[in-house]
């Protein structure tokens, strides 16, 4: 049995937690080490091949670092390799510390532009890993000259939610409030007002609503509260906050028929669940993936149009043009793991 270290964002973010679970379930005969602590372990406790640090492991790790005794398994050392899995991990200034050879990068995307110095560092880092599979074509094309670089649809297109399609009712709205999600505070305010206006119209038309928070750490729940303070009857709106129980959260999401998706993975999970999806775009990572998918439905691209109303968003919902057959994308997303399959299977 091989032992692998997982380098991932462990802050009870639904998308990132599902990355880790999908990875561990794909390789049940591999033992994975993941440094997630406290409540951030909750999503992984029932996954038998995921090794999580206990209190003693954390103390030992801290002590070894303080005494200069070097790294240990929960740093990725002494194992058979490292899997770095995540989306927006190659930002300008990222550490690019992909240690624990052989190292496999799964599912990242590039920024639109890098400084020449950082681009040079990133290219060298990519040369040194066993493989890197980007989740969009544009990111791949920046480094397509490297033989170990490929691309395939996002990992979560292949996620098995273990939920049959059900004809839901009403609208689920995935919210974000992360610093930097919108280019300025003014656009963030326009966003909040547009969502609140939509909610008010839905209340008046008796359309069921559910606000969705994918990650409290990044401020999604703050935006939920901000929206609720701007509607006349907030008690009539259901709220789902992800706290480390992906099964329950996805089941509640599945009860909706349309997903208005600001979170990147709300778009993909909405399609995985067979829903009508209306994307709200605040980043080029979204526009790239939507283009790769051939999505032709209505969306609010906040990168191009700063204004939006609840009335327009509701028209987008009612157009029922946001569904996408993802069968081929699901199949192709498995290529994210091609190099790792060869190494582990």
Where are these regions (language model features)?
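Active-site anion-handling motifs in enzyme catalytic cores
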Residues: 1-345
């Amino acid at each position: 049995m091989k032992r692998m270290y997982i380098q991932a964002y462990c802050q009870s973010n639904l998308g990132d937690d599902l990355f880790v679970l999908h990875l561990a379930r794909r390789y049940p005969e591999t033992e994975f080490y993941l440094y997630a602590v406290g409540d951030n372990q909750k999503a992984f406790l029932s996954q038998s091949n995921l090794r999580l640090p206990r209190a003693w492991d954390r103390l030992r790790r801290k002590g070894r670092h303080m005494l200069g005794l070097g790294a240990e398994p929960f740093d990725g050392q002494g194992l058979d390799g490292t899997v770095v899995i995540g989306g927006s991990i190659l930002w300008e200034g990222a550490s690019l510390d992909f240690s624990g050879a052989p190292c496999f990068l799964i599912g990242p995307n590039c920024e639109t532009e890098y400084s020449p110095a950082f681009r040079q560092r990133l290219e060298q880092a990519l040369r040194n890993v066993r493989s890197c599979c980007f989740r969009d074509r544009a990111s791949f094309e920046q480094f397509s000259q490297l033989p170990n670089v490929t691309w395939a649809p996002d990992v979560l297109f292949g996620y098995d939610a273990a939920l049959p399609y059900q004809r839901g009712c009403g609208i689920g709205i995935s919210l974000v409030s992360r610093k930097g999600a919108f280019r300025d505070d003014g656009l963030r305010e326009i966003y909040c007002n547009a969502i609140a206006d939509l909610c008010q119209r839905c209340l008046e038309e008796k359309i069921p609503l559910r606000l969705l928070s994918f990650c409290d750490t990044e401020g999604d729940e703050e935006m939920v509260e901000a929206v609720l303070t701007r509607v006349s009857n907030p008690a009539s709106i259901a709220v789902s906050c992800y706290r480390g129980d992906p099964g329950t959260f996805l089941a509640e999401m599945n009860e909706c028929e349309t997903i208005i998706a600001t979170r990147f993975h709300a778009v993909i999970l909405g399609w995985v669940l067979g829903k009508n999806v209306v994307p709200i775009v605040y980043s080029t990572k979204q526009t790239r993936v939507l283009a790769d998918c051939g999505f032709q439905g209505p969306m609010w691209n906040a990168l191009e149009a700063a204004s939006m109303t609840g009335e327009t968003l509701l028209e987008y919902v009612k157009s029922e043009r946001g569904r996408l057959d993802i069968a081929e994308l699901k199949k192709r997303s498995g290529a994210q793991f091609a190099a790792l399959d060869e190494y582990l299977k």
